Amino acid sequence: MKIGLFIPCYVDVVYPQVGVATYKLLKHLGLDVTYPLNQTCCGQPMANAGFEKQAIPLAEKFEDKFKEFDYVVAPSVSCTAFIKINYPRLLEGKHECTTSDKIMDVVEFLHDVIKVDHPLGTFPHKVSLHNSCHGVRELGLSSPSEEHVTPFNKIKDLLNLVEGIQVLEPERPDECCGFGGMFSVEETAVSTRMGLEKVRRHIATGAEYITGPDSSCLMHMQGVARKQGITDVQFIHVAQILAAGL
C-alpha cells in the first residue's frame, strides 16, 4: 500500500509541525509513505471565491502528482473534502480524476483503513475536542447533532488511544467556529464573534488544549483568542497529539 502525503499550503507555510507530525505518525505505524515534492495548493481558495477556472490547473497538477498512490492522506479535513467532492466536477471532460476516491483525512485513514486499536503516543493533558464542520458533515468523522443517529466520533476514538489524555467536549460540540475560509474575510465581525464564543465554550471545559483535525479552524480560534488576550489555553492539531512521544 503506497501512501502519498499531501500537505496543504497553509499547513506547509504556517503549521509545518503538523505536517511533520503526520509523516512521523504514518512512518511509526510502518506504512510506506512518500511526500511528493513541488506540491501546490489544491485550489480550494480560488474555487470558494468564485474563480473555479483558476482552480482547474491546480486540480490537474494535483492529479498528476498523486495518481500513482493507493491512498492520499492529508492533515486537513477542509482540503480533503474539497478534493473528494469537487474534483470530479472540476475535471469532468478535461482530465482524468482518480484522487477524489483515494484522498482521506489522516483521522479517517487511521480509523477506517488502518483501524488503529493500540496505544499511540503519550499526552498527559486535558484537551477539548473541536469537531470541524467539513469533518462532521462531509467526511463523516463524527455524528452531526442535527441527525438522529447513534452518536460516534472517530477523532475521539483515536485520541482515547493516547496515554494520559483526558478528552473533553464543549457545549454544542459540532457548532461552527466561524472560520469558513472566505466567510472570515467577507463577514469578519460575525466570524470573529462565532470564534470567540466557541473558544469560550472550549475553555469552560477546563481544558489545557483545544484540538481538532483542521488547522484552519484552530488558526481562526487561536487568532481570536490571542486578540482578546486569552492565553490560558493552547491549540494543537490532532496529529501532533497522536504523534507525541513516539
Give, region by region, the residue ranges found by the protein language model:
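Iron-sulfur cluster-binding electron-transfer modules in prokaryotic oxidoreductases
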Residues: 1-246
